């Protein structure tokens, strides 16, 4: 397995798909990187030469990926929470941030139901 940006990318998959295993690199970014380096998207990762792997690594080092990107995202969320804006309050309460209804759904964000016992008559 080739190691790029601290991530083991799978050998058996096409390079364009293998690069998406790196956090912060999606399909379009991996296509741009490969076209810039004149590497075919259909080549398997195991068939890449050392020079091609190094070229891909140096090209990807220009992007924010993995730990650096995760850190930036978490700092952005912390900043929203500190300034007390609406999005920050929603993050703090563990509710949907982007305007979704939360009366009935939103179970993914809210977590499992906290069941309340019925009043006896």
Swiss-Prot record:
Q: Does the keyword tRNA-binding apply?
A: yes
PROSITE patterns reported for this sequence: RIBOSOMAL_S13_1, RIBOSOMAL_S13_2
> Any transmembrane segments, and where?
none
Q: What family is reported?
A: Belongs to the universal ribosomal protein uS13 family.
> HAMAP family, per this entry?
Ribosomal_uS13 (MF_01315)
GO process terms (BP): translation
Supply the source organism's classification: Bacteria, Bacillati, Mycoplasmatota, Mollicutes, Entomoplasmatales
Per UniProt, which keywords does this protein have? Ribonucleoprotein, Ribosomal protein, RNA-binding, rRNA-binding, tRNA-binding
Protein name per Swiss-Prot or TrEMBL: Small ribosomal subunit protein uS13
Protein function:
Located at the top of the head of the 30S subunit, it contacts several helices of the 16S rRNA. In the 70S ribosome it contacts the 23S rRNA (bridge B1a) and protein L5 of the 50S subunit (bridge B1b), connecting the 2 subunits; these bridges are implicated in subunit movement. Contacts the tRNAs in the A and P-sites.
List the Gene Ontology MF annotations in alphabetical order: rRNA binding; structural constituent of ribosome; tRNA binding
Name the segments for region: Disordered. Answer: 94-121
Looking up Gene3D superfamilies in the UniProt record yields: 1.10.8.50, 30s ribosomal protein s13, domain 2
Report biased composition (Basic residues) as residue ranges: 110-121
Q: How does it assemble?
A: Part of the 30S ribosomal subunit. Forms a loose heterodimer with protein S19. Forms two bridges to the 50S subunit in the 70S ribosome.
GO CC annotation terms, alphabetical:
cytosol; small ribosomal subunit
Q: Which InterPro entries match?
A: Rbsml_uS13_C (IPR027437), Ribosomal_uS13 (IPR001892), Ribosomal_uS13-like_H2TH (IPR010979), Ribosomal_uS13_bac-type (IPR019980), Ribosomal_uS13_CS (IPR018269)
- Organism of provenance: Mesoplasma florum (strain ATCC 33453 / NBRC 100688 / NCTC 11704 / L1)
């Amino acid at each position: 397995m080739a190691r790029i940006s601290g991530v083991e990318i799978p050998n058996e998959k096409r390079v364009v798909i293998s690069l998406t295993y790196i956090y912060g690199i999606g399909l379009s970014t991996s296509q741009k990187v490969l076209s810039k380096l004149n590497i075919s998207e259909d080549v398997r990762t195991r068939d890449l030469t050392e020079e091609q792997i190094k070229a891909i690594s140096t090209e990807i080092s220009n992007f924010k990926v993995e730990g650096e990107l995760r850190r930036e995202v978490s700092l952005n969320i912390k900043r929203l929470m500190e300034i007390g804006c609406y999005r920050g309050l929603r993050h703090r309460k563990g509710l949907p941030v982007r305007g979704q209804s939360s009366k009935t759904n939103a179970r993914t964000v809210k977590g499992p139901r906290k069941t309340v016992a019925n009043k006896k008559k």
